[in-house]
Amino acid sequence: MAIHLTRIYTRTGDNGTTGLSDFSRVAKTDLRLVAYADCDETNSAIGVALALGNPDQKITDVLQQIQNDLFDAGADLSTPMQDSVRNPEYPQLRITQTHIDRLEEWCDTYNTPLPTLNSFVLPGGSPLSALLHVARTVARRAERSAWAAVEAHPGVVSMLPAKYLNRLSDLLFILSRVANTGNDVLWRPGG
């Protein structure tokens, strides 16, 4: 599927509305837009981690796959489930259970060799770890926004992007620990 952007501004949103992928127009304050904007921000936070954190190639590959998935999540959130507009050139992009299963596999792969935690982890340590913690917290907000959109638009917004974001924040936590190579910065209660 090719995407061609010939012009960035359109002026169609200057009245406070924007178009969903089914060509309907909604207020820019619609919770679906909040959710996919938060996915976009999560994607940007991951991009900063990639640019400044110097991850190894395996983690880079994982994070770049996630960045692609986050675009799919945004497309899913902007496409009503009962969308009747079908264009074979532009198939609907949906988060599926396969996306979630892949995140769970990565969680298991990267978490298994880590030492057991005896306290909560403070964001920090290496630059990559700190940046992944920022991405994790943005992903948590995106998840809350996605659940709010599901609740506000029952039967219209899929729950799978919210589930994906839930698992994504878990993976980002695990990867932040991997980035600290076993030297987690631990919370000292009352410390």
From Swiss-Prot:
Subcellular location(s) per record: Cytoplasm
Transmembrane segment boundaries: none
Enzyme Commission number(s): 2.5.1.17
Alphabetical GO biological process terms: cobalamin biosynthetic process; porphyrin-containing compound biosynthetic process
Keyword line: ATP-binding, Cobalamin biosynthesis, Cytoplasm, Nucleotide-binding, Porphyrin biosynthesis, Transferase
Positions annotated to bind ATP: 10-18, 28, 140-145, 166
Annotated GO MF terms: ATP binding; corrinoid adenosyltransferase activity
Catalytic activity: 2 cob(II)yrinate a,c diamide + reduced [electron-transfer flavoprotein] + 2 ATP = 2 adenosylcob(III)yrinate a,c-diamide + 2 triphosphate + oxidized [electron-transfer flavoprotein] + 3 H(+); 2 cob(II)alamin + reduced [electron-transfer flavoprotein] + 2 ATP = 2 adenosylcob(III)alamin + 2 triphosphate + oxidized [electron-transfer flavoprotein] + 3 H(+)
CC terms in the record's Gene Ontology section: cytoplasm
Pathway it works in: Cofactor biosynthesis; adenosylcobalamin biosynthesis; adenosylcobalamin from cob(II)yrinate a,c-diamide: step 2/7
Keyword Cytoplasm assigned: yes
Sequence similarity: Belongs to the Cob(I)alamin adenosyltransferase family.
NCBIfam families: PduO_Nterm
UniProt name for this protein: Corrinoid adenosyltransferase
Record organism: Mycobacterium leprae (strain TN)
